[in-house]
Design a protein with these regions (language model features):
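Amphipathic alpha-helical dimerization/coiled-coil segments
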Residues: 1-16, 34-38, 88-119
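N-terminal helix-turn-helix DNA-binding core of bacterial DNA-binding proteins
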Residues: 15-56, 82-91
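Alpha-helical residues within the helix-turn-helix
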Residues: 51, 62, 68-69
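Divalent metal-coordination and catalytic microenvironments
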Residues: 60, 67, 84
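Functional cleft and adjacent loop/helix regions within the main domain
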Residues: 60-63, 76
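Beta-hairpin "wing" of winged helix-turn-helix
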Residues: 69-78, 85
Length: 119
């Protein structure tokens, strides 16, 4: 095996990266995540997410749990409601992990990637 790949496989971040990617590798979870990213810091109650995505609340609950466990979204109780929001720090960390070894750490080789994460 090549040394670079060996380093990546031994990286303690590999498991966390895979957890984040696996959480997004399903249609309802990806749509939920994108909806929460669009809602900015305000977040959304589970019922509103369910309505927006036309997904049964009990089905959505399992997906919200997976996204929460991955760290990509956060949940906060506000009265009787659970408010879900994107964890932008975790998103930035995931994106950085994906590109940190890109182009042999030569930024000039990754011009397009320099635009990642800029809104």
């Amino acid at each position: 095996m090549k040394p670079l790949l060996e380093d990546l496989e031994r990286s303690p971040d590999l498991s966390a990266t895979l957890t984040g990617l696996n959480a997004l590798a399903q249609e309802i979870r990806l749509k939920t995540f994108r909806l929460l990213m669009a809602s900015e810091k305000d977040g959304m109650p589970a019922g509103m997410i369910s309505s927006e995505l036309d997904v049964a609340p009990n089905k959505l609950s399992a997906h919200l749990n997976i996204l929460t466990q991955s760290g990509l979204i956060e949940v906060e109780r506000q009265g009787r409601h659970m408010i879900y929001s994107a964890n932008t720090d975790a998103v930035a960390t995931l994106l950085n992990r994906l590109v940190e070894t890109c182009c042999h750490n030569d930024p000039s080789l990754c011009e397009e990637l320099s635009k990642v994460g800029k809104c």
